[in-house]
């Protein structure tokens, strides 16, 4: 299998989210004399029918993605031809609209901003591992203090590369979701974790924080080329006072540096606010570097989009996208 530009563009990545998003993963590939573009998405059935016919919309799988240029010698012409080809493809397959979460590191929104009406959402955070002592120079002062105190109290960690099992991680993760009153979407089931091991065992690291021989926090991280992607983590309720979540981020930074990775992508907050608590937590480990996260909205069949909005009695210009899924 040919290596993708990044994890989120890998051909198996979308398969992880078919069940969760109730969709079917697919990749559209466009190649001509001007270059190559691929676009990975999930195809979701729209519940409402129009004149007895079934229609679909497209969405980027969990995380980031969207259309991406692999190479080009005439970018303007390539983009024009891609748009024409993709419009035809959507019409032939009853695809009405597409919602894209562009990749903040690859920055593919720069090439597709006009086509998808790209909209800035928020900052996402980065630790650069190819610089000197990232855990000293890029971690916040209070963060470094929390790490020292946790270690002095006896918290340590272990790193498992390419883990065979992640059963213990799941228990800790679910307990954290319970504590945070998370929506059902984030309660990934056994099939999801089995698929992660099936497709990405060799791109996975499991880090566990331990205290008195007990695993008290754990994190699951993807590695791809020279990037580490923070994925899922959790802490047992009764050990929150030891701040083991800080140890996990410290550990992934140390391990990543030792193993030649260039950066850690922490993602952003739950909202677009710079006072968002998750964003502020992540900023502890990335005080120097960030990047921009954009979304894209594209109506591929205006007539059908408007008909669906009419059926649902919503305004097509509604900011929620696609508008017909609002209610």
Task: Name what the model sees in each region.
Residues 1-50, 102-241:
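A conserved beta-strand-loop-helix scaffold within acyl/acetyltransferase catalytic domains
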Residues 84, 193-194, 198-307:
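Aromatic (often tryptophan-rich) hydrophobic motifs at membrane interfaces
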Residues 99, 158, 264-267:
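Short catalytic-loop micro-motif centered on adjacent basic/acidic residues
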């Amino acid at each position: 299998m040919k290596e993708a530009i990044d994890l989120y563009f890998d051909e198996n990545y979308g398969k992880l989210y078919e069940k969760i998003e109730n969709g079917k993963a697919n990749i559209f590939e466009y190649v001509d004399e001007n270059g190559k573009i691929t676009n990975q998405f999930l195809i979701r059935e729209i519940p409402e029918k129009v004149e007895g016919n079934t229609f679909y919309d497209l969405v980027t799988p969990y995380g980031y993605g969207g259309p991406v240029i692999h190479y080009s010698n005439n970018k303007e012409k390539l983009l024009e031809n891609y748009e024409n080809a993709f419009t035809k493809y959507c019409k032939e397959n009853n695809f009405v609209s597409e919602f894209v979460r562009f990749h903040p590191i690859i920055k593919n929104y720069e090439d597709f901003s006009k086509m998808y009406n790209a909209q800035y959402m928020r900052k996402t955070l980065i630790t650069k591992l190819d610089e000197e002592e990232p855990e000293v120079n890029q971690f916040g002062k209070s963060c470094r203090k929390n790490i020292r105190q946790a270690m002095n109290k006896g918290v340590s960690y272990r790193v498992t590369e390419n883990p065979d099992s992640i059963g213990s991680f799941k228990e800790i993760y679910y307990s954290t979701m319970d504590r945070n009153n998370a929506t059902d979407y984030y309660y990934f089931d056994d099939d999801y974790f089995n698929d992660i091991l099936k497709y990405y065992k060799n791109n996975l690291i499991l880090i566990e924080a331990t205290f008195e021989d007990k695993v008290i926090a754990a994190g699951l991280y993807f590695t791809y080329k020279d990037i580490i992607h923070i994925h899922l983590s959790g802490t047992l309720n009764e050990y929150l006072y030891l701040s083991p979540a800080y140890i996990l981020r410290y550990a992934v930074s140390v391990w990543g540096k030792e193993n030649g990775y260039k950066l850690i992508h922490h993602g952003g907050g739950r909202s677009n606010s710079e006072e968002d608590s998750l964003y502020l937590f992540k900023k502890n480990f990335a005080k120097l570097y960030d990047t921009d996260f954009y979304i894209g909205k594209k109506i591929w069949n205006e007539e059908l989009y408007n008909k669906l909005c009419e059926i649902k009695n919503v305004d097509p210009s509604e900011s929620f996208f696609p508008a017909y899924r609002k209610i």
